[in-house]
Regions:
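Catalytic cores of DNA base-excision repair glycosylases
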Residues: 1-141
Length: 142
């Protein structure tokens, strides 16, 4: 498979060209086989503490649900997130959104009673499409 081939090639390049060290720039990381922009962003933010806002399908889905991006592309979502949030918060916020999504706003089994962010600020058309026109009753307070 391509993934294992990419990892094999990547490990040889790291040993041969970088003395076994992981490069510390986006450009060098993205030039490696099997490393795209999201992976490079994760390595830079979590490995080296460099501000980055990695966007995968989960982050993209949540920011779209919360009306923080137009949902056109992962690239646009990253630009929107970087514009909306302070750079100093990007690394931590990225993880917080992932953990929130796993716990309260999964792709499948989405429950507005648990997903209080989407229930309050979510994209109304998406909520109506997913839960019906009376979706607001799902989280109405007693």
């Amino acid at each position: 498979p391509m993934k294992s081939k990419g990892i094999y090639e990547l490990s040889h390049i790291l040993l041969d060209q970088y003395a076994g060290e992981v490069p510390q720039s986006f450009e060098a990381l993205e030039a490696l086989p099997a490393v795209g922009h999201k992976t490079a962003s994760v390595v830079m933010s979590q490995g080296f503490g460099v501000p980055a806002f990695p966007v995968d399908t989960h982050i993209h889905r949540l920011l779209y649900r919360w009306c923080l991006t137009n949902g056109k592309s992962v690239k646009q979502t990253e630009l929107d997130a970087k514009r909306l949030f302070p750079k100093a918060k990007w690394n931590k916020l990225h993880l917080q959104i992932i953990f929130y999504g796993r716990e309260y706003s999964p792709a499948r089994g989405w429950d507005l009673k648990r997903d209080f962010i989407s229930a309050r600020i979510g994209r109304r058309a998406l909520l109506k499409k997913t839960f019906g026109p009376n979706y607001h009753e799902l989280f109405a307070r007693a």
